[in-house]
């Protein structure tokens, strides 16, 4: 397995139900040509968690994300969001988003109006001031 792909998405401990997604590694690895490989890797990790747990959590580190990168990967972000929502309904326990750039927070505030209340309650954007 490609080392960058491993660090892009991994489970910290085999008994854990926390999936870690790190934008730093996504940025180095992701291209339109390997979006399918990334989706399969994320799906495999979620399936491994769900073989031991009824739900999974996600920790997303967005450090280094820029508006141009959001635009560059917009179609992938939309496609994988819909895919995961449809494939794993009601299986997300919690989603923690850390190091989100200011622009993400502004976009999320607008987009969250279109996300159902149950899903909204599962998403927590961790402010930089709250990181110890």
Which positions does each model-derived feature cover?
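SEC14/CRAL-TRIO lipid-binding/transfer domains and related phosphoinositide-recognition modules
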Residues: 1-90, 94, 98, 102-132
